[in-house]
C-alpha cells in the first residue's frame, strides 16, 4: 500500500503537466500548423510535384481559417477556386501574354476581384475560395509569362500544389483538435458576462448605499470588458466567414452582443444619480432582494452548461415585481410629491436602470438558450438584416492595390528578369491585400511602412546568411522535416492569439515558403539562396510603395471613419430610421473597432495622454449610444396626458442633439476640433420646467405607477443623452487631432 501511495503522485506529476500543455491553445495550434505543413510537403514529394513550396504556403494561409463548419462546402469551394484560378491563368497566359494591352488589364481585373471578394464582409461566405482564385491565377502567370508554351503543364502543377496545401489544412483543421466558432462564442460570452457582473455588483452596491462614486477597479473592469467585446467581435467576423451554421444564425449572435453592451452600460446608469437615503430606506429590503436576484441570474448565465441543457430558473422577475409593488406603495403615500424634483427624477432613473438590467438579463437568457450548440438540433435561423450584399469600398481599394502590385510584378518578370522571380508577385500581392488585418491584429497598417520594410529587409538578409550556413546540415530528410516542424510550431505558437495576420507574420510565412522552395535536402548554391531572398525584398518593396502612396491604410484614418460611422448611425437612430437592428449592431461593433485602432496610433503628434483622451471619447460615445437607443425605444411610450406639455420640449432637444452630432462629425471630417460646441443647458432647463409644471398640476396622481415611471424615465434619458453629448464635446475640444490626423510617419 505504501508503494502504491508513493507511486500515485509520481504518475500524476508525469500525467497532468502533459495534459495541461496540450490544453494550451498556442501549443495545439503550433502542432496543428506543423502537421499541416509536413502533410502538404509529404504529399507534394510523394506526387513528385514541381514546387512543394506552393503547397506549404497554401497550407499556412488556409490554416488561418481556424473553425470547423460545412467541410463539404469548404472542400468544394476551395477545389473550384483553385481550378477556376488555374484555368483563368492558363487562358490569359496561353492566349494573351504576347498582347500586353489585353493580358495586363484582364489579369488586373481578375486579381483585383479576388482580393476584393476575399475581404468583403459579410457578403463573402467562402473567402478562401476567392483567395485561391487569385493565388492560383498569380502562380500560373508567375511561371507562365517566361514560358508560355508550357502553360498547361504549369497550370496543372500549380493546381495540384495548391490543392495539396488547401486539402491538407482542411484535413488537419477538421480532425486535429477541431475548433467550433459557436462553442467559443458561448464561452467568450460567458467570460464577458462575468466581467459585466463585477461592474453591475459595484454599481448596484453604490446605488443601494446612496453614493455616486465607485471603486477605482471599475476603470480596469471597463477596459477588460472592452477586450471581451473585441474578442466577440472578431469571433462574429471569423465565424460568419468560416462556418455556415454560424452565419445562418448571425442575427442571434448580433443580438447577444447588443444586449451584452446594453447590460454593461445600464450598470453605469445606476450610480449616475444619488438618491436621498430617506427614500432609499423605504425600499431598502426590496432593492437588496433585486440585487441578490441579479447576482443569482449572473451566476446561472455564467455557469458551464452542457449543450441542450435548460438554464435553471431564478428569482429575478419575482424580486423585481415585489420592488415595483413597494415603489407603488411609496408613491401612494405621496412621498415623491413632497420631495424635490431632482430627488424624484433620480429615484425613478435608478428604478428604470434596474428594470433595464432585468430586461437585458432576461433577453440574454433567452438568446443563450437559442444559440446553436455542438451536437444539438439547430434552432430555426432568424432573418438577418443584411439581405443584399453592399459594396465595401475599403476592400475595393485593397483589391485595386493588390491588382496593381501584381501587374507591376509581372511586368518586371517579363521585361526586366529580376532575381528571385517566383517570390516577387506573391510577396507584392499578399502584402497589398492584407492591409486592414494588420491594424486589427495589432499592427499599424501602412503607417511607418517604409521603416518596417527596411527592418524586414535586414531580417531577410540575416535569414539568407543563416540558411547559407545551415544548408549542409539540412541535407538529411529527417533533419529537414524536424526543422520545418519546429519552425511552423514556433510560428503558430506566437501568432494564434492575434486576431489576424500582421505584417511580420506574413513576411514570416513567405520566408518559410521560400525556405521549403530551396529544397535544402539537395545541395543549394549560395547564389540561389541570395536570389530567392532578393525576390522577397523586391516584392515587399513594390507592395510598400503601392500601399503607402495609394489609399494608405492609416490607423488615424480608420479611427476617423469609425467615429463618423458612429455619429451618422446615432443620427439615423434619432431620426427614426426603420432599420434599427442593423443600426444597433453597427453601434455595438464600431466603438470596439475604434478602441482597437486607437491603440495603434503611434506617432510623435499623438502622446499617451492624447490616446487616453481618444479612448475616453470612444467610451463616452458608447454611453451616448446606450442612452440614445433607450431614448428612441421609449419616446413613443410617453403618456398621452403629458404629451402636449413635454413633446414640444423633446422635439426641440432632438434638433439640438442633431446639431451637436453634426458639429462633432465636421470636427473629425476636417481634422480640427478647436471650436466651441452648442450648449444644451437652455433646452434641458425648459424640459425641467415642463416637468415641474406637470408635478404642480398633479395630472399623474390618478394614473398607474407606469405613467410617472415612463415620464420621468424618458426625461432622464433626454438628460442623460444631453450630458453624454456635452461630455463628447468637452473631450473633443481637448483633442489635438490636427497634429496627426493627416498622412504622416512614412
Protein language model features and the residues they cover:
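A transmembrane helix-and-boundary motif of multi-pass membrane transporters/channels
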Residues: 1-237, 241, 248, 355, ...
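Secondary-structure capping and boundary motifs in well-ordered enzyme cores
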Residues: 80, 84, 130, 252-259, ...
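Acidic, serine/threonine- and proline-rich low-complexity regulatory regions
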Residues: 242-254, 601-617, 639, 703-710
Amino acid at each position: 500500500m505504501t508503494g502504491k501511495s508513493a507511486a500515485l503522485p509520481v504518475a500524476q506529476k508525469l500525467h497532468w503537466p502533459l495534459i495541461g500543455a496540450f490544453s494550451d491553445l498556442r501549443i495545439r495550434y503550433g502542432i496543428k500548423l506543423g502537421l499541416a505543413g509536413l502533410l502538404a510537403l509529404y504529399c507534394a514529394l510523394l506526387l513528385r510535384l514541381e514546387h512543394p513550396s506552393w503547397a506549404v504556403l497554401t497550407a499556412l494561409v488556409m490554416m488561418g481559417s481556424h473553425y470547423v463548419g460545412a467541410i463539404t462546402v469548404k472542400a468544394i469551394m476551395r477545389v473550384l477556386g483553385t481550378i477556376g484560378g488555374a484555368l483563368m491563368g492558363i487562358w490569359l497566359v496561353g492566349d494573351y501574354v504576347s498582347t500586353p494591352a489585353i493580358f495586363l488589364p484582364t489579369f488586373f481585373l481578375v486579381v483585383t476581384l479576388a482580393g476584393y471578394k476575399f475581404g468583403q464582409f459579410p457578403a463573402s461566405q467562402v473567402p478562401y475560395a476567392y483567395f485561391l482564385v487569385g493565388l492560383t491565377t498569380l502562380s500560373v502567370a508567375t511561371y507562365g509569362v517566361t514560358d508560355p508554351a508550357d502553360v498547361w503543364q504549369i497550370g496543372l502543377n500549380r493546381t495540384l500544389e495548391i490543392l495539396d496545401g488547401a486539402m491538407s489544412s482542411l484535413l488537419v483543421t477538421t480532425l486535429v483538435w477541431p475548433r467550433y466558432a459557436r462553442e467559443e462564442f458561448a464561452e467568450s460570452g460567458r467570460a464577458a458576462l462575468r466581467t459585466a457582473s463585477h461592474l453591475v455588483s459595484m454599481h448596484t452596491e453604490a446605488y443601494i448605499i446612496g453614493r455616486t462614486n465607485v471603486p477605482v477597479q471599475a476603470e480596469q473592469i471597463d477596459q477588460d470588458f472592452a477586450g471581451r467585446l473585441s474578442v466577440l467581435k472578431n469571433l462574429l467576423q471569423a465565424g460568419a466567414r468560416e462556418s455556415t451554421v454560424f452565419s445562418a444564425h448571425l442575427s442571434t449572435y448580433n443580438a447577444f452582443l447588443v444586449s451584452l453592451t446594453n447590460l454593461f452600460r445600464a450598470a453605469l446608469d445606476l450610480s449616475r444619480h444619488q438618491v436621498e437615503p430617506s427614500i432609499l430606506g423605504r425600499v431598502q429590503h426590496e432593492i437588496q432582494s433585486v440585487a441578490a436576484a441579479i447576482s443569482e441570474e449572473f451566476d446561472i448565465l455564467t455557469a458551464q452548461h452542457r449543450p441542450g441543457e435548460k438554464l435553471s430558473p431564478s428569482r429575478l422577475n419575482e424580486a423585481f415585481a415585489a420592488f415595483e409593488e413597494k415603489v407603488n406603495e411609496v408613491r401612494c403615500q405621496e412621498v415623491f410629491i413632497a420631495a424635490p424634483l431632482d430627488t424624484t427624477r433620480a429615484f425613478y432613473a435608478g428604478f428604470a436602470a434596474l428594470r433595464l438590467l432585468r430586461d437585458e438579463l432576461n433577453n440574454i437568457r433567452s438568446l443563450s438558450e437559442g444559440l446553436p450548440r455542438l451536437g444539438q438540433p439547430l434552432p430555426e435561423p432568424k432573418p438577418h438584416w443584411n439581405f443584399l450584399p453592399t459594396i465595401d469600398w475599403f476592400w475595393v481599394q485593397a483589391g485595386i492595390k493588390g491588382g496593381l502590385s501584381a501587374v507591376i510584378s509581372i511586368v518586371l518578370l517579363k521585361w526586366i528578369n529580376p532575381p528571385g522571380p517566383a517570390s516577387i508577385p506573391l510577396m507584392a500581392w499578399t502584402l497589398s491585400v492584407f492591409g486592414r488585418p494588420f491594424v486589427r491584429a495589432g499592427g499599424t497598417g501602412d503607417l511607418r511602412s517604409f521603416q518596417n520594410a527596411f527592418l524586414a529587409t535586414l531580417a531577410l538578409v540575416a535569414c539568407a546568411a543563416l540558411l547559407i550556413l545551415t544548408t549542409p546540415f539540412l541535407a538529411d530528410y529527417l533533419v529537414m522535416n524536424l526543422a520545418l516542424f519546429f519552425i511552423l510550431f514556433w510560428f503558430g505558437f506566437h501568432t494564434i492569439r492575434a486576431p489576424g495576420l500582421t505584417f511580420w507574420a506574413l513576411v514570416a510565412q513567405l520566408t518559410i515558403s521560400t525556405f521549403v522552395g530551396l529544397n535544402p535536402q539537395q545541395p543549394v548554391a549560395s547564389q540561389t539562396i541570395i536570389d530567392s531572398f532578393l525576390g522577397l525584398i523586391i516584392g515587399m518593396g513594390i507592395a510598400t510603395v503601392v500601399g503607402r502612396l495609394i489609399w494608405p491604410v492609416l490607423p488615424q484614418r480608420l479611427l476617423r471613419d469609425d467615429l463618423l460611422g458612429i455619429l451618422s448611425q446615432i443620427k439615423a437612430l434619432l431620426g427614426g430610421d426603420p432599420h434599427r437592428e442593423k443600426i444597433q449592431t453597427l453601434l455595438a461593433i464600431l466603438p470596439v473597432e475604434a478602441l482597437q485602432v486607437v491603440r495603434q496610433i503611434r506617432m510623435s503628434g499623438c502622446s499617451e495622454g492624447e490616446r487616453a483622451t481618444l479612448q475616453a471619447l470612444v467610451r463616452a460615445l458608447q454611453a451616448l449610444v446606450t442612452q440614445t437607443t433607450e431614448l428612441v425605444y421609449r419616446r413613443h411610450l410617453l403618456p398621452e396626458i403629458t404629451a402636449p406639455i413635454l413633446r414640444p420640449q423633446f422635439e426641440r432637444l432632438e434638433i439640438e442633439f442633431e446639431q451637436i452630432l453634426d458639429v462633432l462629425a465636421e470636427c473629425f471630417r476636417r481634422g480640427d476640433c478647436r471650436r466651441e460646441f452648442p450648449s444644451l443647458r437652455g433646452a434641458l432647463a425648459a424640459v425641467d420646467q415642463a416637468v415641474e409644471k406637470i408635478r404642480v398640476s398633479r395630472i399623474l396622481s390618478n394614473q398607474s405607477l407606469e405613467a410617472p415611471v415612463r415620464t420621468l424615465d424618458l426625461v432622464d434619458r433626454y438628460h442623460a443623452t444631453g450630458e453624454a453629448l456635452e461630455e463628447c464635446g468637452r473631450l473633443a475640444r481637448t483633442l489635438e487631432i490636427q497634429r496627426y490626423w493627416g498622412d504622416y510617419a512614412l
